[in-house]
Amino acid sequence: DIGNINSVAHSYLRFERPRSFFAPMSFGNCGYAFPTIIGAKVARPDRPAVSYAGDGAWAMSMVETMTCVRHGIPVTAVVFHNRQWGAEKKNQVDFYNRRFVAGELDSPSFAGIARSMGAEGIVVDRLEDVGPSLKKAIDMQMNEGKTCIIEIMCTRELGDPFRRDALSKPVRFLDKYRDYV
């Protein structure tokens, strides 16, 4: 999805086959990841489909879990739950002298919501459980036809923003746009 999750995934995940990673990049379309993997799974049911999203972006598309359950579309979603809009909050630290506006998220258990919709829900609160939980979820997806939501409980530390220029005046290269702010 968009935000720091996308930046980290793009920097560290490696794939052996083309068309294995879809990302919104800097378009800012929050809630992109989950619907995208649902479409990818329908197109290629023989391949695992995994999305990564922060808790803010996840809240925009999590109801599609029910769509997956109802229509037998097995996917895996990994939700990083740090109870805040991390990228936005970091920009407020860097550009607005720690004046926080609408950066906090008070969210329920996403794994619990997934279970209430008929999917599997796994809560991970220890780093050493991330790998085994992901393997279990992908196994359920590929061998049992189940959708699984992995909720990773994260610290509230703020990472570097994925776009340091997010609040800077853009550089205009074409003359016709130079007068625009």
Regions of interest found by a model, annotated:
Residues 9-14, 35, 62-64, 87-92, ...:
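Short acidic, glycine/serine/threonine-rich loops at helix termini
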Residues 43-136:
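Conserved thiamine diphosphate
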Residues 23-29, 97-105, 181:
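A short acidic, glycine-rich active-site loop
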Residues 1-35, 40:
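Active-site diphosphate/adenylate-binding microenvironment
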Residues 11, 136-181:
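Glycine/aspartate-rich loop-and-adjacent alpha/beta segment that forms the canonical ThDP
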Residues 6-7, 28-30, 58-59, 83-87, ...:
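Short gly/pro/ser/thr-enriched loop/turn and capping motifs at secondary-structure boundaries
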